[in-house]
Amino acid sequence: MDTLASNSSDLTTKSSLGMSSFTNMYLLTTLQALAALCFLMILNKIKSSSRNKKLHPLPPGPTGFPIVGMIPAMLKNRPVFRWLHSLMKELNTEIACVRLGNTHVIPVTCPKIAREIFKQQDALFASRPLTYAQKILSNGYKTCVITPFGEQFKKMRKVIMTEIVCPARHRWLHDNRAEETDHLTAWLYNMVKNSEPVDLRFVTRHYCGNAIKRLMFGTRTFSEKTEADGGPTLEDIEHMDAMFEGLGFTFAFCISDYLPMLTGLDLNGHEKIMRESSAIMDKYHDPIIDERIKMWREGKRTQIEDFLDIFISIKDEAGQPLLTADEIKPTIKELVMAAPDNPSNAVEWAIAEMINKPEILHKAMEEIDRVVGKERFVQESDIPKLNYVKAIIREAFRLHPVAAFNLPHVALSDTTVAGYHIPKGSQVLLSRYGLGRNPKVWSDPLSFKPERHLNECSEVTLTENDLRFISFSTGKRGCAAPALGTAITTMMLARLLQGFKWKLAGSETRVELMESSHDMFLSKPLVLVGELRLSEDLYPMVK
């Protein structure tokens, strides 16, 4: 019996071992089959991707080094925008691909390609890159303009579009804008009456800064005292200088943006500049914002008077504040920074061009006199009829853009543009410089000719929907307030022309129309001598 039991046990054990061995072999075979299947799928995907890239290659561009790509050349060739445009000229292309680290940078100078990207595929290119500068300015991506695509961007974009820059708000704040335009005129009057030279760059930047501060905070100055002639205080000058410093480095091809492991080493010096400029702006903004939030919470303020009040008072579905202080502060900083550079640059260049071409200046003043007369100053209600003045501004936007490129648009997935493969994560740079000077689009592109923008059948507008040049950017990431930009820019130029005759100081008769070596601004600030053009009793006084 024991022998039988033993034999039975041996058989059971052998059977069990056999089953176990069979099971293990089955599992192993299954795993091998799955692994082989996965390998084939990956191989097929690689082949498909390779086939796709053969069918749709990357845009033309240099090969670059492993890992770093063209970063050595980027560091060697400054400013980078001139290097990129010279590369495109050498390659004879209107779309290129330059790899910086692992990022494909895609500059575009062709309106047709630009429309394909920003009109036909706008949603796909709706994101922003993650950069050190943008992280600092946006307080960790809590804003709208420079925040990558996602729920936070959609939330802030909705707030700005429905509550801040809607037509009703634009009309509501008309009187504030009008007062700032009168203040500009009074400030210029005082300088001209005192025979002071007028630095047009200084004046135009501070007018734009005053206008946006007035709309945002209800005041044009950060100082308790004001200058008697209407000019900015030392505090306002420090704020404006920090703002333009920050603007210059918001997107400046910082090496750590393409090689993130270098963040903190600050090899370009960009990180320190951004921290310091942002801190100066915060120094002036944050106390006002904190005090205003406290007033609303304590019931000491109940009336909405400016944009800051709107941000604080917006409620969510539960009746609670929709925005936190950590969202309000960087959003206000972002909007304040977005206002001054484009209008002030366009007006400075426009007047410089007109000093050299007095026939254009004469036509502009003739139009203002015809539309407005000489018994009152131009107002926003006159803008629709000032077509030649607006044509001058359009031409300044075209030929003398404030920046070489728009902020980068990041591709959310692989796509094809103009027959080229654009990988996910690519940064598309729409070239203001290249679009406006494209000889395939513009005849005699380097000449300043406002007449090219006139159309007898329709009113001239500052927006350019066909992307032949950039005035205010378009699409999901476009300028949120073209109406405000139009009002500020047109009123500034119209008041400068209507109220004053301008000439160069001394014996000079021509402006040297040269761009700065490191950006797109006029190489030297435009300094002029003015003369009153209207009856003295029409000029407003500083309040």
Curated annotation (Swiss-Prot):
Annotated function: Converts tryptophan to indole-3-acetaldoxime, a precursor for tryptophan derived glucosinolates and indole-3-acetic acid (IAA).
Catalytic activity: L-tryptophan + 2 reduced [NADPH--hemoprotein reductase] + 2 O2 = (E)-(indol-3-yl)acetaldehyde oxime + 2 oxidized [NADPH--hemoprotein reductase] + CO2 + 3 H2O + 2 H(+)
Annotated PANTHER family: CYTOCHROME P450 77A4, CYTOCHROME P450 98A9
Record GO biological process: camalexin biosynthetic process; defense response; defense response by callose deposition in cell wall; defense response to bacterium; defense response to oomycetes; glucosinolate biosynthetic process; indoleacetic acid biosynthetic process; induced systemic resistance
Topological category with respect to the lipid bilayer: Single-pass membrane protein
Cofactor: heme
Gene3D superfamilies: Cytochrome P450
Gene Ontology CC: membrane
Record-linked CDD domains: CYP79
Key words of the record: Heme, Iron, Membrane, Metal-binding, Monooxygenase, NADP, Oxidoreductase, Transmembrane, Transmembrane helix
Lineage start: Eukaryota, Viridiplantae, Streptophyta, Embryophyta, Tracheophyta
Transmembrane domains' residue ranges: 22-42
Disulfide bonds: none
Enzyme Commission (EC) number: 1.14.14.156
Family to which this protein belongs: Belongs to the cytochrome P450 family.
Top-rank taxon, per record: Eukaryota
Gene Ontology MF: a single term: heme binding
Keyword Electron transport carried by entry: no
Protein name (Swiss-Prot/TrEMBL): Tryptophan N-monooxygenase 2
Compartments where located: Membrane
Predominant localisation class: membrane
Binding site for heme: C479
The keyword Cell membrane appears for this protein: no
Gene transcribed to yield this protein: CYP79B3
Pfam families (alphabetical): p450
